[in-house]
Design a protein with these regions (language model features):
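Sec-dependent N-terminal signal peptides of Gram-positive bacterial secreted proteins and lipoproteins
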Residues: 3-26
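A structural motif specific to WD40 beta-propellers
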Residues: 200, 392-394
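Short coil/turn segments that connect the beta-strands within blades of beta-propeller domains
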Residues: 324, 365-366, 421
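Repeated scaffold domains used in trafficking and secretory/extracellular systems
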Residues: 351-359, 399-416
Length: 459
């Protein structure tokens, strides 16, 4: 499609408001998915924070890789009712204009295409078995005189942590319900070397797994002082971490600023305690990480500016700052809840789902972009500022990362933000100037999204 830049006046008119009603975001011509000896004491007050920061030369020239995810939804039922609800998610590279070497792009197209095809086949196999099990379960319940049957459920989502010309890293977020009191959810990290397309091992990134294990154990004790494992002295947790490291079964993601580790329910604590997660940053433990032989800089460091999807209900460390910079975001039906550096914001807005993205700009400012769904399934964007004493709402804008129609109950496609200076959104119907168009945007002043190209615009 033909593209043209909008004038400053038009852009100002387009986004010169903080909130607006929204109808729906139709899908029009969107590209589909194709296919850690010797560190017995860490100073958690971190008095040398500023000096440690200088140890990492984050890249200012690393090319970003634009991705999209595609979730397919299924409802299996018969004349007696619903048996199984399920969905799975694929991930792929969006075609984009890039004049440099094509090899990294093609390599990741192939790698993510292979990943998605494998996951699709695995999902279909699992779906078939679950459907058979659900039929058997319901039949046995009826035979025993019970008329209640809660449909089985299997969900598979993806949250992209990093996407650039060095690393693509994302979380697989799964949930299964097979009857009983509750289902069971968990995450797993997938980390790809963009130059080779192969999945990275922890030993590709860290120099000494024993040192890494000690760092993880100490950080978990610091991050979760009220947890059941900390209250009992941490012995069981330490044994589990050692075992996971020794057996290469640690779940992790390679983020722009370090490595995050994930411990699913029941592994370190009770089901109610949920998923434990912690991050070891390049800047706080630079000696842990593999360095480039020629430049002596950390091999897998990320770009200076980045965007990162945040899974709701996770508490994430964002830096090794003495400020104890942690972020938690969740939602209830009438509010979006954000906790940052110990301060809490309850933003009262009716919603049924959220999809948050953390943004770190070149000048070090942090913002949250949160796509949220109304009860009608229509999505809109709310922006939050994380740079003051407490999080605050910047505004609401007639755009969304949802690239498909909210009325399509079988498919959902999302644009993935990786570069704060260039990312895709789609305008909504209530935008009279350019409704239902793909927008090329950047993060502007105070976190406000600025549009600088509109798909199909003339003039």
């Amino acid at each position: 499609m033909k593209k043209a830049k909008m004038t400053a006046a038009a852009l100002a008119a387009f986004f010169a408001f903080a909130a607006a009603p929204v109808l729906d975001a139709e899908f029009a011509g969107t590209d589909s998915v194709a296919e850690l000896n010797g560190i017995s004491a860490i100073s958690f007050s971190r008095p040398a924070y500023a000096q440690a920061q200088e140890a990492v030369d984050y890249s200012t020239s690393l090319q970003y890789l634009p991705l999209t995810t595609h979730t397919q939804y299924f409802v299996d039922k018969d004349e007696k009712g619903v048996l199984l609800r399920s969905h799975w998610t694929a991930v792929g590279v969006i075609p984009f204009d890039y004049q440099g070497p094509k090899q990294p792009v093609q390599t990741m197209k192939n790698a993510l295409g292979n990943y998605s095809r494998h996951e699709g086949k695995s999902f279909e196999k699992s779906r078939g078995k679950l459907l058979s099990d659900a039929k058997k379960d319901r039949r046995e319940r009826l035979a025993n005189g019970s008329t209640f049957f809660g449909p089985y459920q299997e969900d598979g989502d993806i949250f992209v942590r990093r996407a650039d010309f060095r690393v693509v890293s994302f979380l697989e977020d799964g949930y299964t319900f097979l009857g009983g009191a509750h289902g069971l959810g968990g995450v797993a990290g997938r980390n790809f070397d963009v130059h080779t397309g192969r999945e990275l091992k922890l030993t590709d990134v860290v120099r000494d797994k024993t040192q890494l294990a000690e760092a993880i154990k100490q950080q978990l004790m610091f991050d979760y002082p009220q947890s059941s494992f900390a209250q009992s002295g941490g012995g069981s947790m330490k044994g589990i971490v050692d075992q996971l490291i020794r057996e290469d079964k640690m779940l992790w993601s390679l983020d722009p600023r370090g490595i995050s580790f994930y411990f699913n329910p029941y592994l370190l604590g009770s089901y109610a305690e949920g998923i434990f997660t912690t991050t070891i940053f390049f800047s706080e433990r630079p000696e842990l990480f593999v360095k480039n032989a020629a430049s002596d800089i950390i091999e897998w460091r990320g770009p200076q500016a980045y965007c990162m999807e945040i899974r709701p209900y996770f508490t994430m460390r964002l830096s090794d700052s003495p400020r104890d910079e942690k972020l938690f975001i969740a939602n209830d039906k009438d509010r979006i809840i954000i906790e940052y550096c110990g301060e809490k914001l309850e933003d009262y807005v009716n919603n049924k789902e959220i999809r948050p993205v953390l943004i770190n700009t070149y000048d070090g400012k942090k913002y949250l972009y949160v796509d949220y769904a109304e009860v009608t399934n229509n999505f809109r964007l709310r922006v939050y500022d994380l740079n003051g004493a407490s999080p605050k709402l910047v505004g609401e804008y007639p755009m969304t990362r949802l690239a498909s129609s909210p009325q399509d109950q079988a498919n959902r496609k999302w644009y993935i933000m990786s570069d704060p200076n260039e990312f895709y959104m789609r305008s909504t119907k209530d935008t009279n100037l350019v409704p239902l168009k793909r927008l090329t945007c950047r993060v502007g002043k105070d976190g406000v999204p600025e549009v600088y190209e509109v798909e199909g615009a003339k003039g």
